[in-house]
Amino acid sequence: MKKYDIFGIGAALVNTEIVVTDDFLAEHGVGKGLMTLVDEERQDYLIKALREQTTHVKKACGGSACNSIVAASSFGAGTFYAGKVASDEDGGFFVKDLNAAGVTFHRIKPKQGITGKCLVMVTPDAERTMNTFLGASLELTHDEVEKQELAASQWLYMEGYLVTDDARTHVAQEAMEFARKNGVKTAISLSDPFVVQVFAQNMSQVIGSGVDLLFCNQDEALTYTNSNTLEDAIEGLKSIAKTFVITQGEKGATAFDGSQLASAPGVSTEAVDTNGAGDMFAGAFLYAITSGQNYQWALDFANAAAARVVSQFGPRIAAIEYDRIKAQFNI
């Protein structure tokens, strides 16, 4: 039996989520519904502009893969996370918040610098817009990816955002190769249509000879496979992933388990905040399959979890909600 169910790699960010208006986004030149990488100066400008926006502010450790690992841990999976923080106040907050969720963080002592931050701006239509300053996360190295702990894991899971620069692409590629050589199953999320379109070469470099499991939404699937229909995208994904999951928002999700397709309808819910839905889905799905469930069961479970997170503000749900979702599925 392995020490960990899932070993995650990704950005280590402190997420600050806040409700804004469409007018605020337009006034400050923020592209709605997108994840935009910004420098420290731009983020400071937005922080100052947001000081007057005091409605529903939430702060938590974050980053896409981090959110998924926290979700999997909260359902009961054994988890480890590799990311890079600085020795500042935000870095301390990140580690404390992550550990509180039951996730083990790497043991490399942080250095001086600035911990990455993500401003998540949610408009009344529940759409989330992210402006991210990666900070220390950009300096992720092979050191944070503790090989002994990775080898002791069932699965490696990483976010596609890692491929947005060459240095972290190499870290991700090496981790993938190490995992394969040591019998660790590999999983990756395509993360964002922008990432898939602009950094397709880096993504292909990391995926290499193929992954055991790939997560994406329909737009990402169409973009990465250069397809016009979902059917064509499904055929294209079969050449790079042994299994995969395509989320389709309100329509639910489709998965390929290596031999056949499975699908699950969307769970009817009133969307309050879509931030974290995809991350929650991936975390819940990974928890399900590491617990021995099949892909159809995992789809239904992950759909229910994602619906629960979009029905409230913030990418996290209360501890009791994880128990309620499990009870819904008799576990």
Q: PLM features: residue spans?
A:
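A short, aliphatic-rich alpha-helical micro-motif
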Residues: E149-A151, I207-G208, K238
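Hydrophobic beta-strand scaffold residues
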Residues: T79, F105, T186-A187, F244
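Short beta-strand scaffold segments in enzyme catalytic cores
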Residues: K117-M121, G252-A255
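Anion (oxyanion) recognition and catalysis
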Residues: S73, N99, R180-K181, K238
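Conserved phosphate-binding/catalytic region of the ribokinase-like
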Residues: M1-F7, A12-L13, V19, E27-L37, ...
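Substrate-binding N-lobe of the ribokinase-like
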Residues: Q43-K117, L134, Q328-I331
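Conserved phosphate-binding/catalytic loop of the ribokinase/pfkB sugar-kinase fold
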Residues: H106-P110, V120-G160, D165-D166
